[in-house]
UniProtKB/Swiss-Prot annotation:
Keywords: Lyase, Membrane, Metal-binding, Mitochondrion, Transit peptide, Zinc. Constitutively expressed in roots and leaves, with higher levels in flowers, particularly in tapetal tissue of anthers, inflorescence (IM) and floral meristems (FM). This is Gamma carbonic anhydrase 2, mitochondrial. GO terms for cellular component: mitochondrial membrane; mitochondrion; nucleus; respiratory chain complex I. The gene is GAMMACA2.
Length: 278
């Protein structure tokens, strides 16, 4: 942006702020009788001067996430709750089908000790776990960055490579394809199995489907939410505790007064094996 562009941008900010200033003055004149309403000015997509995010229409960006400045995000990717992608001093590129999970920070480097100008480049079908930090580095297609991992300037995570959860990857480290690195500082741990490589790709696909569900829920209007709540209430199963709170007494037909393990008709209920979730 040239000098004239910056001047126009600054004047535009002044004009936009005039209404806010008048509102504040009016509130002060009302004294102790004034009513103040503090509104959140959070914006999911925010420009920095003339640099604005370029986001595909099929991308899910959670309402509490922030995508700022020179950021490009490809089709089918998802930016989850609390994430910040800050392309203010350099650019960020996120490929297609990539998921950047909750509370992750992605930033860039304009200057550092080595003097390199480093954008952040994240490829296709990448999974970035919760609360990771990715700064001025490259993550290639089908890679996996574990929860809480930190990748510093100049790091390259090659295709089908994995960074273990909680790891700190030092500057200018290259993690070769098919390897797992972990620790602080991160070092080679072992080779990925074929099953783990398939899992990484499947993880990205799972998040594409999950993002569609969240996008649908977040796009609902207030009226839709109220209608759905009324329907749930209308068709909710009324148990004895619910009825007793309302003072309702229902008669149960004699043919339905059966032990819990017996169905109508005298057939026993098949025993369902328990499932343990990790």
């Amino acid at each position: 942006m040239g000098t004239l562009g910056r001047a126009i941008y600054t004047v535009g900010n002044w004009i936009r702020g005039t209404g806010q200033a008048l509102d504040r003055v009016g509130s002060l004149l009302q004294g102790s009788h004034r009513i103040e309403e503090h509104l959140s000015r959070h914006r999911t997509l925010m420009n920095v001067f003339d640099k604005s995010p370029l986001v595909d229409k099929d991308v899910f960006v959670a309402p509490s996430a922030s995508v700022i400045g020179d950021v490009q995000i490809g089709k089918g990717s998802s930016i989850w709750y609390g994430c910040v992608l800050r392309g203010d001093v350099n650019n960020i590129s996120v490929g297609s089908g990539t998921n950047i999970q909750d509370n992750t920070l992605v930033h860039v480097a304009k200057t550092n000790i080595s003097g390199k100008v480093l954008p952040t480049l994240i490829g296709d079908n990448v999974t970035v776990g919760h609360s990771a930090v990715i700064h001025g580095c490259t993550v290639e297609d089908d890679a996996f960055v574990g929860m809480g991992a930190t990748l510093l300037d100049g790091v390259v995570v090659e295709k089908h490579a994995m960074v273990a959860a909680g790891s700190l990857v030092k500057q200018n480290t290259r993690i070769p394809s098919g390897e797992v690195w972990g620790g602080n500082p991160a070092k080679f741990m072992r080779k990925l199995t074929d099953e783990e490589i398939v899992y990484i790709s499947q993880s990205a696909k799972n998040y594409i489907n999950l993002a569609q569900i969240h996008a649908s829920e977040n796009s609902k209007s207030f009226e839709q939410i109220e209608v759905e709540r009324a329907l749930r209430k209308k068709y909710a199963r009324k148990d004895e505790d619910y009825d007793s709170m309302l003072g309702i007494t229902r008669e149960t037909p004699p043919e339905l007064i059966l032990p819990d393990n017996v169905l109508p008709g005298g057939k026993p209920v098949a025993k369902v094996p328990s499932t343990q979730y990790f």
